[in-house]
């Protein structure tokens, strides 16, 4: 039985802003409530590690990756980077030459492929592909460049917002080599990553998510 649970964090349903997760671990804010560790263990079946990025809680916005690697922004502090390296046995690449810092908003990846924002320079996309061990394409979704904040991918499926065109859905499926379908969370919100944290084992979703949205989420990732 796959677990999917609706929660809030810091009084908001926008839980994905604060959490990065894959099939091996989760990264959560340094001051997250202890019950979050338990929720992650119960639903995602991984251990949670407490970190900060640029001195903030915004782990989900700043980080992107898959089970092979992690991409971090130039604003990460040296001490934070060393902490990540001590915790994790994955490739970690810092995008020092990229002006944008919300890497989680710009990269959608699983272990089969990667979709990067057209905002990113080709040199950065090549470094991301190397770190994650996959091929990486660049595209927008519904003319919006923030492919990472609009979508959520695992090795079992991809959730895309309703503004994605049929052609874009097909392109994402070909890049990530899993089925994609449309979803909203938190009562119709289309920036899926802000309200959804998923891996191949389960998911956490914002507490405003409706029963219908939960059922669609189950269909996309766990059927």
Swiss-Prot record:
Q: What is this protein called?
A: Translation initiation factor 6
UniProt-listed PANTHER family: TRANSLATION INITIATION FACTOR 6
In its keyword annotation, does this UniProt entry include Protein biosynthesis? yes
Q: Which UniProt keywords apply?
A: Initiation factor, Protein biosynthesis
Functionally, this protein is described as follows: Binds to the 50S ribosomal subunit and prevents its association with the 30S ribosomal subunit to form the 70S initiation complex.
One short Pfam name that applies is: eIF-6
Q: What is the lineage of its organism?
A: Archaea, Thermoproteota, Thermoprotei, Thermofilales, Thermofilaceae
Biological process, per Gene Ontology: cytosolic ribosome assembly
Similarity section: Belongs to the eIF-6 family.
Q: Does the keyword Protein biosynthesis apply?
A: yes
Enumerate the SMART domains for this protein. Answer: eIF6
Q: Encoded by which gene?
A: eif6
Under the GO molecular function aspect, what terms does this record hold? ribosome binding; translation initiation factor activity
